[in-house]
Structures are given as structure tokens and as C-alpha cells.
Amino acid sequence: MADRNDQILTPSQLNSLARDLLEGSFPLVWVEAELSSVTRPASGHLYFTLKDARAQIRCAMFKPKSTWLKFQPREGLRVLARGRLTLYEARGDYQLVLDHMEEAGEGALRRAFDELRARLAAEGLFDAERKQALPAHVQRLAVITSPSGAAVRDVLSVLARRFPLLEVDLLPSLVQGDSAAAQITSLLQRADASGRYDVILITRGGGSLEDLWAFNDERLARAIAAAQTPVVSAVGHETDFSLSDFVADVRAPTPSVAAELLVPDQRELVARVRRAQARMTQLQQHALGNAMQRADRLALRLRAQSPQARLQLLHRRQQDAGRQLRARMMQVLERLQARVQQGQAQLQAHNPQRQLAGLQQRLRALHPQAAMQRRLQHDQLQLRSIARSLEAVSPLATVARGYAIVTRPADGSVVRSAAEVVTGERLRAQLADGSIQVRVESGES
């Protein structure tokens, strides 16, 4: 019979104490073993057993963690698992709850990866300052990948759809296995040295850490860092990271995304070109309008200063001067005609014959012959002086200098202006030595 002082526990209490002891005594543990009895119910959780030749332990990996597995758990697969020891109290089952699991062999690779990444990072190979920017317009692209993988199909499909004018050279290479890293490195160095390419793309599809190990090679990482040509790395899926991703100038999460990063969409380019053309047309029309306005202003200035315009101006001035000259000549002729008429009147008043008759009468009245002779001589001198004065103002003297007096035969009126005559009219022109009949052919004022 039990001692009354001993504590009596229920199964629940005992299992709870055992669970606390296990969880408190063991931190995270790594276990390498073989999978057995793998089940995945509708809940999405993963249940299986880890075993070796002599023992086994039940394991659970709940859905949030199991969905990130990079492989499909299957019977007999050797894995490396990390988790915490616990006790399932309802059944008293001792088990390991895992938060990470990878295929066996990846553990050593992961440690090697972490060590190499830390060393290259310390050397500055991952620094953003040394990375090159991608060119704005990629014209030639080198793609280093497997010629038969899904990655190359994805890349070429996206490139053909978005920008079919791109010149693409496929440099076929192994992307998995012992010789893959050396082959990729050699192709990269040759493509870079050729100077033919604007960008070099290194890519492959997803896989385990061991499958992707060629892209964690130190020689490849240093070749990417030393390349003069910008390098894009697109290895595996979005959750996969390799050293080539860290050291490359640009890391793309997938091969398809890498292709989209490298080339623009041709539809977007067409739209941009159309917008640029519309803008250019608008600017051309604006510039043409301004140029036409300037040309019109210059044409007006040129017309105002052209020889033809100046000749027209001079012609108008000549016509004006001609009209003024004709008007002044008519004024002069009118004044001369008035003076002629006045002279004729004076001539009639001082007709020598009349004066001579008067003088003769006076002479007859004078009886001294000598006095009469002197008087006659004096009167003759006066007569000559008057005759010279009359001759100076006589129209006949003007006519003698080359002018003509034009009159109408019908009434003897003097023609003073070209506007007074009509074509075909007959006129009389008085010259120095006679008169002539003339006929008007044309008139100009």
C-alpha cells in the first residue's frame, strides 16, 4: 500500500511533468535518419518516423513549416531534421516536432555555403557600390543555361513575346553536377572577353541545394565579380538563393522575371513611340507656324525694300513730278500768253506806223528840217527799244526756242493740258517758222 506522504499523480499530470522535463532539458537538436511511415492528412500536417538500424522516433511537422519543404518526403529517404523534443500528453507518445528538414547531405553543403558567403561578403564582393547598372536598351544578350531545361524555354518565350528584335545567343552548359561550375565559369569569361554582349544571363530552374550547388562555386562567384559585362543571375525559385545571386549585378527571383527585367514590352514601346510622334508633330506644327509668321514678316519687309517696289515708288514720283512739271509749264505758258496778249495790246498802242504817222504829222508841222530829223532819229531809237521789249515777251520768241503753241483749229483756243484732248483729235501746232496740223494718237498725263 502506498505511503500517504507520497504524491499520487494522474496520467495527465505525469505526462505533463515528463513533457516539461523533455522540453527543458533538450534545446534544438539535429537528427539524421531515414523516413518511414510518412503520412499527410487533410490538415496539411506531416507525420512520419525517423529511424536507423536500432531505433526510431515519432516526428511531426506542422503545416506552416511543411509547406516550405524543397523536396517531397517519401519512404526510405534519408534526411537531416531539426526540432525540439516533446511529449504528446494524450497518448504519452514521445516525439520530435520539426521546424526544418532537408535531404541528407545538404547540411554539410549548407555550412559550406554559409562560410563561403561570409568570406566573400567580407571581401566586398556583394557590395552595392561595385555592381553595374543594366543598360537602358539591351540589344545583344548571352544566356548561359541548359539547352533542354524549363528555364531556357521560359526565358526565350518571354523575350519573344516582349521584344522579338533582341539578339539572343544561347551558350549551352551543364547546370548540375561536378563539372557544371567550371563550364559555366568558362562560358562566362569567354562571353565577357568577346565584348559582344550588353548583358550576360546565368539561369536554371529550381532544385535542392545539392542540385543548385554549381552556382555556389567560388570560382564562378569571382568570375561574375570580375566581369566587365553586367551579369544577371536567376537561379531556382524565388525562395532559392545562391552565391551567384549575391555577387551578380542583378538578381532575378525566376528566369521569367529575369527576361522581363532585361527587355521592355514592345506594346509599351509602341505606345511610347506614338506618344513621342504625337508630341513631335505638335512641336513641328508649332515651329512651322512660327516659321511661317517670321517668313511672312520678312516677305513684307523684303517687298517693301525690293528693287521692284523701289522702282514702283520712283515711277510714281516721276509721274507726280511730270504732272507738276506740266502744270508749271501750263502756268508759264498761260503767263506767257497773257504777256503776249498784253504785248500785242501795247504793240497796237505803240504801233510804229501809228507813231510814224503821228511823227510825220508833227514833222510836217515843224519847219526846221534839222530838228525834225533829230526828232525822227530819237523816235526810231525808242521804237527799236520798244520792239526789243515786245520781242522779249512775244510768244513767237518762246516758240523760236523750240516750244510750240497748240490750238484747236475750230475756235483757236489754246490746249493747256493733255487731259483736254482725245485720241484722234486734230490740232494746230504753231512753230517758229510756221504751223503744222497734228493728230492725237495717245495721251499721258
UniProtKB/Swiss-Prot annotation:
CDD domains: ExoVII_LU_OBF. Its EC number is 3.1.11.6. Its main location: cytoplasm. One of its GO terms (cellular component) is exodeoxyribonuclease VII complex. It comes from the Bacteria. It catalyses: Exonucleolytic cleavage in either 5'- to 3'- or 3'- to 5'-direction to yield nucleoside 5'-phosphates. It is found in: Cytoplasm. This is Exodeoxyribonuclease 7 large subunit.
